[in-house]
Amino acid sequence: MSEEHVIPRWVSKILAEDRRHSGRPQVQRMVDRQGHLVRELPPSKLINVVTRRVCKVCNEGWMERKLERPCQPILGPMIRGWDKTLDQSEQAVLAGWAAKVAMVMAYIHAPPQPVKREWLDWMYWHQRPPANWYVWMASCNGQRPTYFSSDAGAHASLPSGPMVDVYAQAATLIIGYAALKILGPTSVVRVEEPGRDAVIRLWPLTGETTVRWPPPRHIDDRRLPLFVDMFLDPGQPPRPLS
């Protein structure tokens, strides 16, 4: 096994440019769905959070070639807040990268929150989110340059015509100005879309040739909890997914 950085090291150089890191030190809190503290550390240390749950061959092989390297020219401009147009291939790469990070994040909990074996196998073979997963992107223009939350077994109420209750792997990533929401339900369900003025679906692909980021509306500090809790019911206890 090797050390896999939850937030890849190439991101740190970009985040160092963010002026929101200047001034008084901030503490990054990584929490689960019940608000239980997973990790607490300054942004300068966030990049060093690692898990030893990834094999060396995967970490230095397909994860690097198929996800990390292709994702850098896609996500890098978004972290900086620059306009970015994503074609379908880029949408799929970014969605796959986000799903990979969500799965890795589950293992930094104490105790670790195991990810379903079939999801891990799917990522290995396809480097894309599992078929029943959803990934959305947004733009965050708050005071905090980084925010991460992760939970395996979150209770979700999904608008699929009638509301459908499921349990899911869930994660939120705020990296600079880029915001990503990942939701992996345990059962196949078609989720009706939230308003596209602030949130854009990456996965499953919408069929649009290109999508433009950022969307018309930004997420600020006041709206961030709404994005974090999108479709989730924090009042319900989680349950193991594996």
Residue ranges, per PLM feature:
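General N-terminal targeting signals
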Residues: 18-20, 25, 79-80, 111, ...
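Short, structured coil/loop segments at alpha-helix boundaries
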Residues: 8, 12, 55, 87, ...
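Short alpha-helical interface elements
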Residues: 31-32, 79-83, 123
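An N-terminal structural lobe/cap that precedes and organizes the functional/catalytic core
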Residues: 1-62
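C-terminal, charged low-complexity interaction regions
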Residues: 115-242
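Low-complexity, flexible helical/coil segments
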Residues: 30, 89-94, 211-219
